[in-house]
Amino acid sequence: MMRTISEEALQRLREAFPVGCRVELDYMNDAYNRKLTSGSKGTVKHIDDIGTIFVSWDCGSGLGVAYGEDSCHRIDE
């Protein structure tokens, strides 16, 4: 189910995950994903207008973290 994000929540998300920050995947709800697992790390490339966090994952994947479906957290590296 696609979830919507308010302008305020989108702004908070963009502040919490600025371009270039490092993230670690907690959970991804994608039955076809074979590369990413919990603990995968990557670099934020951008966040679109529906709140998807696009990441350049260290494993080579470019899958986005979908707002309200998937989960990641910022890490300091």
What are the functions of these language-model segments?
Residues 2-14, 18-77:
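Basic/aromatic-rich interaction segments and small domains that mediate binding to polyanionic partners
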